[in-house]
């Protein structure tokens, strides 16, 4: 008999049988070896065949293993094994059976039939396990479905639907699918398209995360519950698993063979199956090699003839990129657009999913948490879609509470650390013999006893609370299972089981759950098992860096005294500090316009008066770091062509992939202070970009992504009108000076730009009185640097006044002061430190002598 007439699976099994015989030192390959190999083969057909025929496979395996152990072992043959006469006879019988069935190739299931028609040890074992020729013959007919074995890969194509699809209706029956809330319009539209005579293939298109897959799951649940028109009743929804279809298809044509097997199986089902292809665009080009046909082209004939009932799902971008390019494939599908649900719909969806997440995380999700998840995610996460982002928020909040429940409470942890500390001290004191140590040891023992008693009481309480939570969880799991069983009983019409569950089991479990939950609420001291809006806000704050969590009293106090904090760094600019503080307070109190930035300001004034310093102080106040400020020097954007660097180069230009200078910074940190320094030096086209930011709080970058600026503070600084400020300082009050400066500003900037800014703030020139305070701030930084090297420095009042005089320049503001400190203090100090005149550890005093500042110890 020619071995190339065996199917590829049968050939592999024969090779495995040879390896088995070699490994066991048997001289011949017996039918037992081949049967063992066939039963252990991955993706083989013999094991499923025997199982479907009702044969006891476990017993058969055990008998074969024992028989193999009894076979004679021969050593020193040098790895030479031959097929036994019995195996050759059985294989010839297989050939005869294949010819009788008009098969071109011999498939592995015929081996079972041949063994039963033969006589031998294996025949007796099969019969003992319950196999007969008639039973196996019938099982083979059922499995083949009337097909002939016409090619070597025929066995791989068999049961293709079972191998390469997931039965969603079966999962719906078992209650494994999440409930689908709302989306009635989309499900109805999908059913409507499926009911058509031709082109009855809907494709669900929408943004990622809006619930396209959920709609198909909802359809499967409706079919199971019988809530569909007559034409769709008793149909099955199968989801095509593209991963397993492509995985392992090493040779050319293997993928097409598998897909053909799926399509053949579908055509045999005669319209009783709806095939769901998630990520439909993956079918276009899938399996396409040199001259090979891709999956999309193989689907076209089946779709056109109506043999294939298909539901696709893909995103808008991928539909445009892949499906629309292939007009022949596109016309065979009917589009069903899935829009993002509203916040109200999302709240309803979350309420429906609540029980599943409570069961998974073993927590209780409150209704305010659900409302907060929908509203906060809608407002603060702009680059993702509802309901996906809201579900993720609830999921992660539940996960964080579960983590806290599983770890030791903080109070217990603190006590444990204290006990360890006391025990260490006790061991040390035991070695001492003086009276003071003995007295301390007695006190220590008393404290240790008390702490250990406290610890054991707390631990008992913690364990009791955990046990109570576990009990509640078990009741919830039982209740969920009872509801699923009730649904299954309703479908099959088992009235006795339904009444037992509906009027007996479920009410009893609900009563137990209510009692356990009430008890839980009274007794819980150490553990938290409730997800509230606070946890949801904390998760969102961790994701985005935007502080949306409820303000603690300490933060409220901090916001109320914000001006004092900012004045510690910015001297003398009361109007500017007040304007910025009010904007931040409005935002944190939730009163600011949700569609605009927190605040947008134009700071005007001479150089060196604190415009940039105020931005740094604000960034430090909000984020505890100067680095949280996005600083863009607008003098870099003087040319027209450099404007595109802010939002990123357009498609086709170099640097398109890199994104924009401004947009990327804000996309990564949506909550930040943006400083546009020296804004009047920028090209006028820059202001066209800024109009969108200041008015709508959004900007579209070069790649078409919308960047959210609603949680940023936009500050622009400019020197416009600084000469007028210098000129009229002291002669005019603040409002008059602002009017004069605004005349200059309105000539330089367009009205629509000025109109969108929240406030234009004019900074005053600095007076002599201000410079002494600024000198103190600058010197504090110097003192810190010297402290690190072991020097303690103080300055006398005359020296401070001398510095103020030396650094005063009404034109240049506070910057000359920095130079004065460098020349008068830092330079002499550096020389004295290096020459060894100043000794670390001895205080240093800075004083004035002969018109110079000197350091004395």
UniProtKB/Swiss-Prot annotation:
Residue numbers spanned by region Repeat 2: 83-146
Keyword NADP tagged: no
Linker: annotated segments: 341-545
Binding site for ATP 1: 206-213
A GO cellular component entry from the record: cytoplasm
Coiled-coil annotated residue ranges, if any: 404-492
Location of region: NBD1: 159-340
One MF annotation (Gene Ontology) recorded for this entry: ATP binding
GO biological process: cellular response to heat; protein refolding
UniProt cross-references to InterPro entries, sorted A to Z: AAA+_ATPase (IPR003593), ATPase_AAA_core (IPR003959), Chaperonin_ClpB (IPR017730), Clp_ATPase_C (IPR019489), Clp_N_dom_sf (IPR036628), Clp_R_dom (IPR004176), ClpA/B (IPR001270), ClpA/B_CS1 (IPR018368)
Domain Clp R: 3-146
Compartment list: Cytoplasm
SUPFAM superfamilies noted in UniProt: Double Clp-N motif, P-loop containing nucleoside triphosphate hydrolases
Keywords, ordered alphabetically: ATP-binding, Chaperone, Coiled coil, Cytoplasm, Nucleotide-binding, Repeat, Stress response
Region (C-terminal): 766-857
Chief localization: cytoplasm
Comment text on domains: The Clp repeat (R) domain probably functions as a substrate-discriminating domain, recruiting aggregated proteins to the ClpB hexamer and/or stabilizing bound proteins. The NBD2 domain is responsible for oligomerization, whereas the NBD1 domain stabilizes the hexamer probably in an ATP-dependent manner. The movement of the coiled-coil domain is essential for ClpB ability to rescue proteins from an aggregated state, probably by pulling apart large aggregated proteins, which are bound between the coiled-coils motifs of adjacent ClpB subunits in the functional hexamer.
Subunit architecture: Homohexamer. The oligomerization is ATP-dependent.
The protein's role, per its UniProt record: Part of a stress-induced multi-chaperone system, it is involved in the recovery of the cell from heat-induced damage, in cooperation with DnaK, DnaJ and GrpE. Acts before DnaK, in the processing of protein aggregates. Protein binding stimulates the ATPase activity; ATP hydrolysis unfolds the denatured protein aggregates, which probably helps expose new hydrophobic binding sites on the surface of ClpB-bound aggregates, contributing to the solubilization and refolding of denatured protein aggregates by DnaK.
Protein known as: Chaperone protein ClpB
Species this chain originates from: Yersinia pestis
Gene: clpB
